[in-house]
Amino acid sequence: MHSNILPVLTSVATLLGLVQGQSQQPYRDWAKAYEAAETLVLPWTLEQQANISVRDGTAPGFVPFEPSDGVRSVQGSGKDYDNPAMRTSSNLDDRTLHELYLWPWIDGVANGLGSVMCVMNRVNGIIGCENDHIMNGILKNETGFRGFIVPDVTAPVDKAAGLLGGLGWNSGYSVSEIMAAVKNGSIPESVMTEHALRIVATQLNLLQPPEEYAFPVETADLNVRDPSSKDFIRRAGSESIVLLKNKNNTLPLRSPMSLGIFGKDAANLATGPTPQSDFSNFAGDTYDGHLITGGGSYSPAPYVVSPLDALTARAADGQGFGYKYILSDNWTVTPSESTGEGFFQTSGVSVSQYARESEHCLVFINAFGKEGSDRRTLADETGDKLVNDVADYCGSTIVIINNAGVRLVDAWIEHENVTVFTDLIPCSNQVHTNMFCFPGCPERRRSRQESGHAIVDVLFGDVNPSAKLVYTIAKSKDDYNGQICECCECDYTEGLYIDYRHFDQAGIEPRFEFGFGLCFKSDGRANIAAYTTFTHSDLTINPSTDITTLQPYATGPITEGGPSDLFEQILTISASISNTGGVAGAEVAQLYLSFPDAAKAPVRQLRGFEKVYLEPGETKFVSFPIQRRDLSIWDEQTSKWKIVGGKYGVVLGRSSRDFTVEETLELLTI
């Protein structure tokens, strides 16, 4: 089975959802995930496919999924549930369900999604894995899903309700119990036939030709690693680093003589153990070593290159710098009284001593998150204190955060000696890296076992960072809306307004907005370091159909994804991107649309992004196909996707708040 645990959105910054999802917005989440999974799996042999579980199409909870410690989820109706998540109900209106939580699933279904996992919790009062409206009504009938549904960890409380509600596999029944239920009429034979057809058809579709379909009774460990994957993982990790601050063009580092390395996140946990799956217990706000993944159900990395490992390799390779390190977040800041006399006088190792003696100080901190429990805080006081302690004595403090979602930074981001900042966040059980350099800052995501190399590649300018934030970093935790619901009726009162949509609607100034990220330029010479610059121009809107006589509703026959005309291309929006700097770099152009007032929609919504690599002086054109779906809202009165006639705003920019070119568009419906 190919499966990929996606896509998850969450309305609360501390919830586990950010550890298991890709972003805080629904745009094309699944489309890109499916393309990546397909690219990964296609070259595999049938033997490899039979022996390896890749996780592609089975996602962690269809629609609202936020269960864990304090839960906003879906379950319980007067029954005695052992699992706390099953006592909790995610209650939300139909428009929010469709425009936020269902949206990325539509991409998955449209791209041939094979299987879906139903959630443990309740949705609007009904257990997710027994919910006929969610599984049959919306997923199978409304979106045209042709695959099968599996349960999350625990079987439904009512086995028959699960089968009748759409659950096709592992309902909790034995074969003999199912046969008896069919025989006595409590489960119609037609229901079981449909489930069987969906399972077999999906397997044959993914593992054709059918006569070669591998069905091993016993499986053995099989090495499917491609030696070249190491380089890919390293490059993907470094290109996923988000640079958030780079004061005085601190990065890339140019022939440094001495580095100070601080923080437990700089090295692997010396005594072990390696991370273990633990779904039940809160594991703390931070991890006691270099964090490369969120906790939970995942395949462990075969090895981990920490930042200290990577720096050691670079120093040993004749790079001309030395380093000292303190691999602790709470080491002595100032020296104790001196002992000894003359040449033998010493005052002991301290943070202040190593910071003073270092040309640049690298501070590594992290924020941990895991499946089975929510995060307790958005900032770690010990880590914040370490940053300030180092920055008090080091004029060039570079902060690298490996974190499982949002991590507040206002305790130190304005410190005059913090020159660089980067941020890494675990997504899909992976970690993002944010870098802040005092004077600068980057963020990194998903470098896994090559994490240390990926970070160091950016620090020394081997790779120009070009990634963008996939969530908003606020100035205060109080700026976020949505609160963890302990139990049991959890109302999604924020509706459509999560993350940047909330900040825009409420007029709140973030510290770093959704989509933000810096880059620097380096031509490989040690004395070159500056921002590369990009310009956006020539924004054009080309209708693909008559936009003055549009039908308001999508009414086509149901295909995979929904009504066929929902995917009709209405417009093509294009623009030119130019590199006006002196060296090569990459820009992520982001397209946002605003809807007419009558739509009562968020201020702006992401509807496209494109990453382009440009040589100095080069210009490339980007284009964004806009479907009917991109211009529609969910009409709760008719239960249909609807285009609201009126003026639409079209903006292209570098983030959700930094716009470079704007246009307006008027759509008329009949």
From Swiss-Prot:
Residues modified by glycosylation: 51, 141, 184, 248, 330, 417
GO molecular function: beta-glucosidase activity
Gene Ontology cellular component list: extracellular region
Catalytic activity, as annotated: Hydrolysis of terminal, non-reducing beta-D-glucosyl residues with release of beta-D-glucose
Pathway: Glycan metabolism; cellulose degradation
One annotated GO biological process: glucan catabolic process
Annotated signal sequence range: 1-21
Protein name, entry field: Probable beta-glucosidase N
Lineage: Eukaryota, Fungi, Dikarya, Ascomycota, Pezizomycotina
